[in-house]
Amino acid sequence: MAELSIASGIVGLLSLGIQVTQSLISFYSAYKDQDGDLAKITQNFEDLQGIFQSLESAVQDRQSQGDMDEVLKEVDKAMQGCHEIIEELQKECQKLHTDLGLSLKGHIQVAGRRAAYPFRKSTLQKLKEDTARNQNQLDLFLHSLPKDLDETYERILCSIDENYVDDVCRILTLLCFSARPLTINELIDAHAVDLSASPHLDREGRSYEQNDLIDICLGLIEISKTEDSGQQLLIARIAHFSVQEYLQSERIQQQKANRFAIQSGPANTEITQICLVYLLEPMLSSGVLDTIKIKEFPLAHFAAEYWYHHYVNSREGRLKVEELLQRLFQYDTNCFVTWIRIYGLDRQGTLRPNSDYQRPIDDIGSPFYYASLLGLESTLSNMIAAGARDASFLEMVNAQSGEYGNALQAASSGGHWKVVQMLLDQGADVNAQSGRYGNALHAASSRGHKKVVQMLLDHGANVSTQGRELTLW
């Protein structure tokens, strides 16, 4: 609606400009044969009218292109000069005619009653200069109009204060690639994560407010209201899909705004880092975990549930987050337990709640188990390297743990064949009975992971264990 209002105002103003210049052309045309100056002035008015018509056409063309809110705002801003020019033309028109509604014939009759040449040379000279100046201004304005959305977005991005460039890049990255829409409070906390040499949640950055984000992003984002379980939420979004398309396009790479370009791999890597740093925040894991604590850390649920989604989509950027993963999957920290309590990923597909803030420790699998469930090869490899010399390591490999019973069944259910091979190499019991599927072979078969099924069979998996029916393919 705002877009239509802006467009209507611009078109209305230009239409008035066309009307006024037509009236002036009609008047001066009656005299233009008497003096070269009058002929020049008439031509100037005709040129002005042509520019107004071109501007009107340009605005209407842009309006028809779809979401052109930012283009029209740019046009409206630049139209301030047109306001002044048209007001000046109106005053000139009012000097000559008390009634703009007179027909051309009426103007000629009025002119005929005047003296044969009622114009002063000084007046004509000034009018000629004024119309030429107005023509130049409008012509410059016409050529300065953004040709399309790309040029509009480029101008907006290049006009962002240098002090806020990194902030805007972070915000746009989050909104373009977050696994689900972010609330304004989630976005503020995600923006507040400092990924410098010592990654941490920056207290000062958390003091941002909704209007701060909107102001520095110059119309590239918007806030909408929605309801979830009766609670009203403010959701932050990219203002239009065309903004995201431009930011991810190859075109932006060739433009001045190229530092704002966003690519899937690096963007997902950055969001993975943000989520992991947030989960490693000491204050989140200290004290009692309850709804009050979660309210203090609004990004906690998103970070707990979606860091793995973004990790998978990081591609070659996964190595950059390995150190953070090692910290999260440590045995002697509360961060790991807090993560699982916020989002128990192994409870997916069960009747048990994913979020269980008071989930007993003995109901939570080991970091080794969850690394196997997610197929985190590097993380698991480091754990194996660190624990291989420990006499109790084999017990950990086969430990009864979590919804899937043990690490091998967890890895098999996800089809993580490389992890399955690592576990088998470490002596994992291929026929261990426990968990959701009973054993690793049934887990792999039920999920259609043929390669894992074959690997388990090659290592002695018993097809008829406990009488379960096994479908191999």
Curated annotation (Swiss-Prot):
Keywords: ANK repeat, Glycoprotein, Pigment, Repeat, Signal. The keyword Repeat applies. Residues 1-23 form the signal peptide. Gene3D superfamilies: Ankyrin repeat-containing domain. As colorants, MonAzPs are widely used in various food products for centuries. Moreover, MonAzPs also possess wide-ranging biological activities such as antibacterial activity, preventing hypertension, lowering cholesterol levels, causing hypolipidemic effects, and displaying antiobesity and antitumor activities. The keyword Signal applies. ANK repeats lie at residues 403-432, 436-465. GO terms for molecular function: pigment binding. Glycans are attached at residue 462. Induction: Expression seems not to be regulated by the azaphilone pigments (MonAzPs) gene cluster-specific transcription regulator pigB. Part of the gene cluster that mediates the biosynthesis of azaphilone pigments (MonAzPs), a complex mixture of compounds with a common azaphilone skeleton very widely used as food colorants. Seems not to play a direct role in the biosynthesis but might have a regulatorx function. This is Azaphilone pigments biosynthesis cluster protein L. The gene is pigL.
